[in-house]
Amino acid sequence: MVPWAVKKFAFDPDKFVHELVDSIIGDHYPVPDRMLVHNEQIVHEYLQWAMCGDPRPKGTFKIYAVEGGTAAMCYTFKSLKSNRILNPGDTIALGVPIFTPYLEMAHLEDYDLHFVEIHAKQENQFQYPAEEIKKLLDPKIKAFFIVNPGNPFAVALSAETIKLIGDVLKKRPDLILLTDDVYGTFVPGFRSLMGEFPRNTLGVYSYSKYFGCTGWRLGTIAIHEDNIFDEIIDKHPDKIKKLLDKRYGTLTLEPRKLAFIDRIVADSRDVALNHTAGLSLPQQVMMTMFSLYELMDTKKAYQKACLGICKKRFAAAVEGLDIKLGPNEYFDYYYGLLDFEFFARKYVGEDIVKWMKKNVHPLDIVFRLAQEYGIVLLNGGGFAAPDWSVRISFANLENHVYDDIGRAARAIARGYRERYEADLAKNGNGAKKKVPRSKR
């Protein structure tokens, strides 16, 4: 691993080995605080592969090594507010369904943001249609936050959807993009917004999902050297600039030249403790090793193995559900969103959907799965997904469990259908509207 890295990055062997050995001991604070010199170069190359796809963007991303995607979210929100890029009362757009904390953080008193929902449509294979993307043309929307591939629906942006966003940026070059791409490595050839629109994008990544290392707390914040964040700060009125001068004046004699990425570092330790900022040194060594392992695997055997596991479990769940699904090249197989309303409408009809909404509480599904089958799933409503949906994770359980999940979900759906038919019969409509056996 060490000889490969020395050759690949033209490292001085002694300096690289010293960084590894000195850091694994963990006897002092990170220097530089944002990220170790060799680690940043290695992680930069890893992110180019994992996030940017082809063609790679020109120039360099500056990276801040952080304690997982969670810390990346917290630090980013805090610095956007501290630097008056997003202010209380401002409006952002959220690509929904989305990881629940993005919905919750916007409402916190700390930020007090309004948000517009940009909906990925299930009937459009969870891509954002043109009419939804056009909402971003509204000048009051300052930023678009997105998880790509999605959580809970597990679909990456298609080339067509990325183009739609690009069309918006041509008219709104001031629009901030924040993309959380934790699941990108589960889609071969994945293309992040930070690869397509580096100037407008702040990229968040975590190693936790792909390497199964949640407990290590390894994540990154990446901002291109040519970015609109620094430009927005530079255009602040003099009154705000003076306030920011005071905030960051203890760090440098020229605080107005301090890049946004370095302000994030300082803000992560409330500025006053900036000298203690940064991801712990042993964690950074682990980040180096994970990144090098993937870069050295030119045949992508590890990626294929990970995808193979998830695909096998997905297939078992689908078999248990006894449904047929078409292929989707942008599906990452990490999660699956099972929407009872969508499938009831597709296989039975609109009448049973109306009956469900009148007679079944959306949480009934997850409670019955837990009480009757010992299966614990998250309800989709918490992600701003359809109310009668549940999220299945294909990364956590033994293979044999997934066909059980499929059969249990199907049994609950069958129970709803039987209750629906019983109500029809009770009202004298059973013979007329009984569900055909082929649709059961």
What are these regions (language model features)?
Residues 34-37, 41, 49-57, 134, ...:
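PLP-dependent enzyme catalytic core of the Aspartate aminotransferase-like
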